[in-house]
């Protein structure tokens, strides 16, 4: 089957979140299932620096973008055999900053043009209008940045099937009315049943409203987004399309995330020999200038510092533990300036008990997963989440809120599951500092029971969330759409 996989970010070329991991791992898993899958993404300047050998395959003038000559570059996704197409429109994509924001942290004002052009290019590839003599059976678009492509393709009678995956409904690609006009979209689409959303243009509605099938990244999240609490104003549309909505759990690339092979670690280890994990803990403590005390529980967190991730809950719940010297905490992430400052203040108050890295570092993320005893993920909502699955494989017991993919992947250490020896972590329900503090107290009590803690670690390490299972589910969906 021929599959065009469209994403605005793909690891290891560029990454701001889990979308990049999925956009690398799922195509590779489909390739291993002998599918003809090709990835298309924008040619940001930093991507061109990392992409290796590239060949110019065609030059296009896309309708609606008279000022931009688009060059399509062909290569291979690094570390794989997956063909890669890069959309090179220098005025729009070769910029400093990340894919969506300027160096000052503000969104690029012309993101609607940038990702409108990206969608138009996806349409041309899908209809084999780029002169490449290749037409996909399925076009798989991801998040709002590719959201207009299913809409554009829906206007053609003879076209590939379309799949749209929601990785995080909170990010919708909303723009002023003038953006709709600038993209020369059909006037009849300026309607609540089209692309209009409370007076703004919504890119994500292009995918949700017009794709042949919608997926999201865990079964629980697929149910949650049908509710007013988690639907972000789109629950009505999603309920209308619930018959073509499926939750497919993301997978983990265990070639990248395996403590037995991880090149970023000072020592490697397995469920049968955990001695290397103690060395990783000592190395993490040393890196953050914390006392290298093997007996103190070390809590870890990696993620964007935004309200969704519940970092504020973590900082409030952890402070009494830090003040009492009952735990250490290491946090890696960046985002909201207020949350960053709160984290800095806490680290300054407890320099012997808290380490902080503002920013993101892939090696450090691996080292934290290996060195921490407990990974804390108190998300207010979490479409899937990857770090809790990484933590399980690394024997780092996750403490998670009972939501979305966290609920689907972590088995709570309640008395019944402890007795059955299938518990893998701690869940809590309410998004409050007290509920998290209670969950951490449960975790610490188990930590101080070494035999029980080792069973928890080993049960987590035995879990299998590999991409093969997820890729087969997507392939079954693709086949249903084209049959």
From Swiss-Prot:
Record's catalysed reaction(s): [(1->4)-alpha-D-glucosyl](n) + ADP-alpha-D-glucose = [(1->4)-alpha-D-glucosyl](n+1) + ADP + H(+)
Sorted UniProt keywords: Glycogen biosynthesis, Glycosyltransferase, Transferase
Enzyme class, UniProt record, top EC level: transferase
* Enzyme Commission code: 2.4.1.21
- Note the InterPro entries from the entry: Glyco_trans_1, GS/SS, Starch_synth_cat_dom
Family membership noted in the UniProt record: Belongs to the glycosyltransferase 1 family. Bacterial/plant glycogen synthase subfamily.
Protein function: Synthesizes alpha-1,4-glucan chains using ADP-glucose.
Write down what this protein is called: Glycogen synthase
Gene symbol of the encoding locus: glgA
């Amino acid at each position: 089957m021929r599959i065009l996989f469209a994403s605005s970010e793909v690891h290891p070329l560029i990454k701001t979140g889990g979308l990049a991991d999925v956009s690398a791992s799922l195509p590779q898993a489909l390739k291993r299932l002998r599918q003809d899958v090709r990835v298309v993404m924008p040619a940001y300047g930093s991507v061109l620096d990392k992409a290796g050998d590239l060949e110019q395959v065609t030059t296009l003038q896309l309708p609606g973008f008279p000022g931009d000559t688009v060059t399509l570059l062909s290569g291979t996704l690094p570390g794989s055999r997956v063909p890669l197409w890069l959309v090179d429109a220098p005025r729009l994509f070769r910029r400093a900053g990340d894919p969506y924001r300027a160096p000052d942290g503000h969104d690029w004002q012309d993101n609607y043009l940038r990702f409108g052009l990206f969608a138009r290019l996806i349409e041309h590839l899908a209809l084999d209008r780029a002169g490449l003599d290749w037409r996909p059976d399925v076009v798989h678009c991801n998040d709002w940045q590719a959201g207009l492509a299913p809409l554009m393709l829906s206007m053609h009678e003879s076209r590939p099937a379309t799949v749209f995956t929601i990785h995080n409904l909170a990010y919708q690609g909303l723009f002023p009315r003038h953006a709709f006009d600038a993209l020369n979209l059909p006037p009849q689409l300026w309607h609540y049943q089209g692309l209009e959303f409370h007076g703004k243009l919504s890119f994500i509605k292009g995918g949700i409203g017009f794709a042949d099938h919608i997926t999201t990244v865990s079964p629980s999240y697929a149910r949650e987004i049908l509710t007013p609490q988690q639907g972000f104003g789109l629950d009505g549309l999603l309920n209308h399309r619930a018959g073509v909505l499926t939750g497919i759990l993301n997978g983990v690339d265990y070639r990248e995330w395996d403590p037995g092979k991880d090149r970023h670690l000072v020592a490697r280890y397995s469920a049968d020999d955990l001695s290397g994990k103690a060395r990783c803990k000592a190395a993490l403590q040393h890196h953050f200038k914390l006392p290298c005390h093997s007996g103190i529980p070390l809590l870890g967190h990696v993620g964007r510092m935004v309200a969704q991730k519940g970092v504020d809950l973590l900082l409030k719940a952890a402070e009494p533990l830090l003040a009492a010297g009952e735990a250490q905490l290491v946090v890696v992430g960046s985002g909201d300036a207020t949350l960053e400052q709160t984290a800095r203040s806490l680290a300054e108050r407890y320099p012997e008990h808290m380490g902080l890295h503002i920013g993101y570092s892939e090696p450090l993320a691996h080292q934290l997963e290996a060195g921490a005893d407990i990974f804390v993920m108190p998300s207010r909502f979490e479409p899937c989440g990857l770090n809790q699955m990484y933590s399980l494989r690394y024997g780092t017991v996750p403490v998670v809120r009972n939501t979305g993919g966290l609920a689907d992947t972590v088995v709570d250490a309640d008395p019944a599951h402890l007795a059955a020896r299938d518990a893998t972590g701690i869940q809590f329900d309410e998004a409050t500092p007290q509920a998290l503090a209670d969950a951490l107290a449960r975790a610490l009590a188990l930590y101080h029971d070494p035999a029980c803690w080792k069973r928890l670690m080993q049960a987590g390490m035995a879990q299998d969330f590999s991409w093969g299972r997820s890729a087969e589910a997507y392939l079954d969906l693709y086949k249903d759409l084209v049959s």
